[in-house]
């Protein structure tokens, strides 16, 4: 994930600040974050193979990795918004991240876990599970990019009502 970030960050310098921010949110963040979380799920699969029995386990493990990531990221966002903008800013950040989208990272990483769980159910070895893991990772990255992009390019609340709430 760090390598992806190192490659993508300099490329953003070629864009104007507004476009660079949008690309960072819609392209860079989903790739970097989902690869990092996906590696966590893959490590659970490789080293906890006896407890990784199928798609439901994959969803649960992926969701837990995503929840841990979201918890950590939210603490960082809350602290930064409090320092930079005070009570009003941290309140806005809390509503946006803590109430409107607490399960976004959970949902994205669960997709990666589901793909690995299906591979387990089919009897895949860790080596054979690499392609299903990549497929799940692509799904997670796409959902994350769609989610972040909705705040930049589309109607965030329409996506929230049609995708986030039902899931």
Predicted regions and their residues:
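Hydrophobic alpha-helical segments at protein termini of multi-pass membrane proteins
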Residues: 1-167
